[in-house]
Amino acid sequence: MMYDIRESGIHNRGMFARERIKKNSLVVEYIGEKISKKESERRGIERMEEARRDGGGAVYIFELNKRFDIDGNVPENEARLINHSCSPNCEPRVINGQIWIVSLEVIETGDELTYDYGYDLEHFLEHPCRCGSKKCVGYIVRTDKRGKLKRILKQHRKREKKKR
């Protein structure tokens, strides 16, 4: 195994390199139950409602292809513990019908493994980011939406300032 699971400064627990990991290495498979898109949507909504009610209900659903997703909310899926970063050192890739977490760069022993969760803007306020990256915008949103988010936040701050 190339990794250890331990406490993370980003969020709860995380995955850390046990040894130096070369660029483009298959680090860990993201495993879980293969489910239809309809079931995926149902579970996603259910878990988001749980999260709003009691702070739990994390969603670990990954898109596999146009017909199926993987629900990684199973105890044996250690990849679900990989935290988000706005400057990730890994990314998920579908390879031969499996989801793999692949290193984007050389990762040194002890470094936390991260990837960009790629959330849309729709519910950004529900997903604050604590990655600490210089590129961090304060919320977990996909890279191509960060410019728009910065504009939204700037407009919001202006409105708040006028209220005072």
Residue ranges and their predicted role:
Residues 85-164:
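C-terminal SET catalytic tail plus cysteine-rich post-SET Zn-binding segment of SAM-dependent SET-domain
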